[in-house]
Amino acid sequence: MSGQKKKLSWRRRLKIIRDICRGLMCIHRMKIVHRDLKSANCLVNKHWTAKICDFGLSRAMTDSPLIESSAAGTPEWMAPELMRNEPFTEKCDIFSLGVIMWELCTLSRPWEGISPVQVMYAVATEGSRLEIPEGPFGKLIADCWAEPENRPSCQEILTRLLDCEYAVS
C-alpha cells in the first residue's frame, strides 16, 4: 500500500473502507464471522470497488460466542480474543476492520518489522495497539480496537464515516 500514496486520495480510501464495511455488514447479517479480514483479503477493482474474499477461516455464528481450539487468522490484523482462543463474535472482524482503516490512513503495513509471534504477544498479552493516527479516523479506529462488547457495529461505522468524509473533504 505504501507505493500507492500519490494515487490514493481520501475519497478513494473512504470508498474502500465503506465497501469493506458494507460487505462485512452483509456477511454478519448472514451469521458469518470472517476471522481473517485483512487488506490482502479485500480485492479492489478498476472502479475502486472493494470486495471481501477468502472465507477459508470463516465460521457460522450461533446465539452464543464461538470458541475455537486454536488461533486462526493473520496476527497483524487479528483480534486479541482470537489470539487468546477466547470466545468470539462478529466483533472480531470489527477489530480487523480497524487495522485496515489504520492502513488506509497511514498507507503503512501494520507492525512492520515485528515478527507475527511478537505481534501476538504484544496485542494479546500486553494489550499493545498500533499508534492511533491523527485526524478524523483516530477515534473510530480506537473504538474498533476496544473490548469486543464496546466495538461499534458496521452500521455505526458507516454513519461515523460520514463525519470523517466531511472532515477530509
Predicted regions mapped to residue ranges:
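Protein kinase catalytic-loop region centered on the HRD/HxD motif
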Residues: R22-I32
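Terminal C-lobe "cap" of eukaryotic-type protein kinase domains
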Residues: E147-S169
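Conserved catalytic-loop aspartate of Hanks-type protein kinases
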Residues: D93
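Conserved activation segment of eukaryotic-like protein kinases, specifically the C-terminal portion
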Residues: E68-E81
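Structural helix C-cap motif within protein kinase domains
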Residues: T106-P110
